[in-house]
C-alpha cells in the first residue's frame, strides 16, 4: 500500500473513531446527573501509533532471530487496530457516585468536533487531488 492510499485509509478510519467518540461524549453529557453513572472514553490513537511503528520496524528488515520463539505472537498491523470504549470506574466526582465533569466533557466535545472538521477537510483535499490528476 502506498503512502497516499494509507493516508486516505487512516483519515477515513479516524473519522469513524471520531464519530464513535462523539457518541460516547454525548452519552456522558446526557448522564451528567444520573446517580452512579461512570463516564466512558474511546481509546485508539496509542494502539494505532504502536501498530504503525511496528510496521515500520518490520519494513526495515530488522534481524529478529528465530520466529519459532514467538509462540504464535503476531504484531498488530494498523488495519487490525480497533477503537475501544473504556469505562472509568476509579474516579468519583460527586457524592452520588457519578464521575462526569461537565466542563471536561464539553471541552472534549469541542475538541472532537474540531478534529472531525479537520479530517473531513483532509479527506476532501485528498479526493480533490485525485480528481485533478484524473482530469
UniProtKB/Swiss-Prot annotation:
The keyword Repeat appears for this protein: no
PROSITE patterns assigned: FLAGELLA_BB_ROD (PS00588)
Localization, UniProt: Bacterial flagellum basal body
Main location: other
UniProt KW keywords: Bacterial flagellum
GO CC aspect terms: bacterial-type flagellum basal body, rod
GO biological process: bacterial-type flagellum-dependent swarming motility
Domain of life where this protein originates: Bacteria
Family note: Belongs to the flagella basal body rod proteins family.
NCBIfam families xrefs: FlgB (TIGR01396), PRK12622.1 (NF009265)
Function statement: Structural component of flagellum, the bacterial motility apparatus. Part of the rod structure of flagellar basal body.
Oligomer status and interactors: The basal body constitutes a major portion of the flagellar organelle and consists of a number of rings mounted on a central rod. In Gram-negative bacteria, at least four rings, L, P, S and M are present, whereas Gram-positive bacteria lack the L and P rings. The rod consists of about 26 subunits of FlgG in the distal portion, and FlgB, FlgC and FlgF build up the proximal portion of the rod with about 6 subunits each.
PANTHER family linked: FLAGELLAR BASAL BODY ROD PROTEIN FLGB, FLAGELLAR PROTEIN
Name of protein: Flagellar basal body rod protein FlgB
Gene of this entry: flgB
